[in-house]
Curated annotation (Swiss-Prot):
Cellular compartment(s): Cell inner membrane
Disulphide-bonded residues: none
Domain of life: Bacteria
GO molecular-function term, one example from the UniProt record: symporter activity
Gene Ontology BP annotations: plasma membrane acetate transport; sodium ion transport
HAMAP family: Acet_symport_ActP (MF_01426)
Predominant place of localization: membrane
Organism: Shigella sonnei (strain Ss046)
Membrane topology: Multi-pass membrane protein
Job description of the protein: Transports acetate.
Name the UniProt record assigns to this protein: Cation/acetate symporter ActP
Family according to the record: Belongs to the sodium:solute symporter (SSF) (TC 2.A.21) family.
Keywords: Cell inner membrane, Cell membrane, Ion transport, Membrane, Sodium, Sodium transport, Symport, Transmembrane, Transmembrane helix, Transport
Membrane spanning residue stretches: 33-53, 77-97, 103-123, 148-168, 183-203, 206-226, 262-282, 303-323, 355-375, 404-424, 428-448, 464-484, 493-513
Amino acid sequence: MKRVLTALAATLPFAANAADAISGAVERQPTNWQAIIMFLIFVVFTLGITYWASKLVRSRSDYYTAGGNITGFQNGLAIAGDYMSAASFLGISALVFTSGYDGLIYSLGFLVGWPIILFLIAERLRNLGRYTFADVASYRLKQGPIRILSACGSLVVVALYLIAQMVGAGKLIELLFGLNYHIAVVLVGVLMMMYVLFGGMLATTWVQIIKAVLLLFGASFMAFMVMKHVGFSFNNLFSEAMAVHPKGVDIMKPGGLVKDPISALSLGLGLMFGTAGLPHILMRFFTVSDAREARKSVFYATGFMGYFYILTFIIGFGAIMLVGANPEYKDAAGHLIGGNNMAAVHLANAVGGNLFLGFISAVAFATILAVVAGLTLAGASAVSHDLYANVFKKGATEREELRVSKITVLILGVIAIILGVLFENQNIAFMVGLAFAIAASCNFPIILLSMYWSKLTTRGAMMGGWLGLITAVVLMILGPTIWVQILGHEKAIFPYEYPALFSITVAFLGIWFFSATDNSAEGARERELFRAQFIRSQTGFGVEQGRAH
């Protein structure tokens, strides 16, 4: 039976995202037993790790940050595993398959945010915080308001990501494995809850590390086989691809994805600063022992991800040659079976046969599990640590805080499953773009200015943060993706697809204006505390260190 996957085009603008979704109507496929067996091996192995981790999780520090005992190299792999999703793998290779060189340019947008994290954020974040980025933002500002804002920003980003990820998981698994959509969503939700509930950050970290190794191995093998086919010559690779692609030499020309400079700038800023405001990524810097290891984490993560994106570029061009030119992978209408996002999966079959196809399918599923586990832990910590322990019940014991965290994991898991089922046939591609815009417009400005600007006050952070968050949401709703494609209006009120340029500007201006005009005694006290914060951020004096179990 031929595979039919329609309506994938709508997801391509965000397909390269680290947590994007595969959306559209999917026809259920014959059961892929090789893929299911390989995935079951992965599940059994990772559940064994979760059991091992559960024996070591004795405290709040163990649960949230694995006791701070993850090394820089391990954390770098885990960050890469958290950031590289199934849609990142399938989406970027699909963009290269359809658009050529533009696919590489688009993928770089997700990479350029990491030098910002390396040079501006990683060390100071580790020296100032313990469990969440709200620890840093509220270091010298009023705990209650800042933690509520930070938690809201985190939970909105996590919720949008989780919905996109769960729907993407259901669609992808239905396509690759032949499993029922609802079964797939429930399976992902249950496994996600088990990893986080029992193993905490330690189990989540190792699931992400294993997934990163498997994905990098699979992508490396595919790229190697493609290069072997062309005699390890990039000249031959590009020449053969241009010879068979419908666009010919145009696939080597940039500029086809984004139509105007404003959209290009807004997209770039959203990707760059959004990465530096993602709660599940920032949380990973508290799992290492000190600022030096945090810096090494970013160094290794950037290397792994840069290597991965180079591989997807080769895989995309390989798919043009070995898949696009092969009628075996086309339907009766001449379109790629399963849609363009299946280009890498078909290439896996072309270079490694059915067994390797099963392996890549299992890796795609494992990838989803690793990402949703990190998201769930970030959401749970925002509720239990930021809201419960520091706002609603100050002085709560570690045991009470952990209990609230685990209850939150269960609630988030159930909500994710329910929303995954409800959004089955909805266009959810915009959710990822909105999550990035909110992270860039609310979380990032507050984190950056709280660490670097001595005149920041609680009033400025609150007004600017809320303005950035609301502006991002409103402009996204009024833009072409939601206002026209989803709500059905003829013309968008806000003409640009990506709101980040405007919402980030509003956030920074709001923070500056309301801080500069804050003449209160509280504001003066917060400015005076900057020097002590600066010393702590540079030296790490007083920071909670990793400890041996």
